From Swiss-Prot:
Binding site residues for NADP(+): 166-168, 191, 232
InterPro entries reported in the protein's UniProt record: Aminoacid_DH-like_N_sf (IPR046346), NAD(P)-bd_dom_sf (IPR036291), THF_DH/CycHdrlase (IPR000672), THF_DH/CycHdrlase_cat_dom (IPR020630), THF_DH/CycHdrlase_CS (IPR020867), THF_DH/CycHdrlase_NAD-bd_dom (IPR020631)
Species the sequence originates in: Halorhodospira halophila (strain DSM 244 / SL1) (Ectothiorhodospira halophila (strain DSM 244 / SL1))
HAMAP family, sorted: THF_DHG_CYH
Biological or metabolic pathway of the protein: One-carbon metabolism; tetrahydrofolate interconversion
PROSITE patterns: THF_DHG_CYH_1 (PS00766), THF_DHG_CYH_2 (PS00767)
Reaction catalysed by this enzyme: (6R)-5,10-methylene-5,6,7,8-tetrahydrofolate + NADP(+) = (6R)-5,10-methenyltetrahydrofolate + NADPH; (6R)-5,10-methenyltetrahydrofolate + H2O = (6R)-10-formyltetrahydrofolate + H(+)
Name of the molecule in the record: Bifunctional protein FolD
Length: 290
């Protein structure tokens, strides 16, 4: 029986609508609307598309969106100064610097310059550490979005055998922590892992994030497994495809995400949720200081 499709586009639309309702309620109570600053360095075509989608989603949800499009040759110091000003800006609750950055700018330095309470990407070491320690904090958008998708399947995650393919700081590592926190038994596969196919076959849940189109073949997927394809790759033909052979895998999986229309929309929806959470957290900090 073909897998059920985890429609991230539809679920994300509902999540964005809920954020919009919450923003409207804030304004009715006399609170300011949440504010997000998005910084784009250079004009990487893919990054520019992602940034446009994020800004549009903010506007639709009633979130204040400020755009900072910087030249590709901007110095690291100038970028850090911009972040410092946004850290101090009372109208801004979230700061997002679109990655990747040009080679002359150190990404980790930039990430660590963002105030952790405004780090809506969830990449700051403080927020990563809080995730590892199972403490409240701003969580990386894509893994948090994946957990929302999994919740919509109604499947009990506790005790499941999960395989995460990829160990990036953006997806693989925080995804592993999210699944550990859900009490899964997690195996991480990377470029030095042996017998990857066999490890995947044994999994109840597979999360693929390696950036290699079709790497995970259909016969790697165990019968009834849940497959989350985070990969998004553009082929020479212009077609977008994931890391999983969708057609073959969908004949074995119980649930599977499409590419596009699976995880991508959830990442954007989660960014809005994080921005709303950041605004609420700052409200609490302000009230506590009074």
């Amino acid at each position: 029986m073909p897998a059920q499709i985890l429609d991230g586009k539809a679920i994300a639309a509902k999540r964005r609508a809920l954020v919009g309702e919450a923003v409207g309620q804030r304004i009715e109570r006399g609170l300011r609307r949440p504010g997000l600053a998005v910084i784009l360095v250079g004009q990487n075509p893919a990054s520019a598309v992602y940034v446009r989608n994020k800004r549009r989603a903010c506007e639709e949800a009633g979130i204040l969106s400020r755009a900072y499009d910087l030249d590709a040759d901007v110095s690291e110091g100038e970028l850090l100064e911009r972040i410092d000003r946004l850290n101090a800006d009372p109208e801004i609750d979230g700061i997002l610097v679109q990655l990747p950055l040009p080679g002359h700018i150190d990404e980790q330095t930039v990430i660590e310059r963002i105030d952790p309470v405004k780090d809506v990407d969830g990449f700051h070491p403080e927020n990563m550490g809080r995730l590892a320690l199972r403490l409240p904090g701003l969580r990386p958008c894509t893994p948090r979005g994946v957990m929302t998708l999994l919740h919509h399947t109604g499947i009990e995650l506790e005790g499941r055998d999960a395989v995460v393919l990829g160990q990036s700081n953006i997806v693989g590592r925080p995804m592993t922590l999210e699944l550990l926190n859900a009490r899964c038994t997690v195996t991480v596969c990377h470029s030095r892992t042996r017998n990857v196919a066999e490890r995947v076959r044994q999994a109840d849940l597979v999360v693929a994030s390696v950036g290699k189109p079709g790497l995970i073949q259909g016969d790697w997927i165990g019968e009834g497994a849940v497959v989350i394809d985070v990969g998004i790759n553009r082929l020479d033909s212009g077609k977008l495809t994931g890391d999983v052979d969708f057609e073959a895998a969908s004949q074995r999986a119980s649930w599977i995400t499409p590419v596009p229309g699976g995880v991508g929309p959830m990442t954007v929806a989660t960014l809005l949720e994080n921005t709303l959470d950041a605004a609420r957290n700052r409200d609490e900090l302000t009230a506590a200081a009074c």
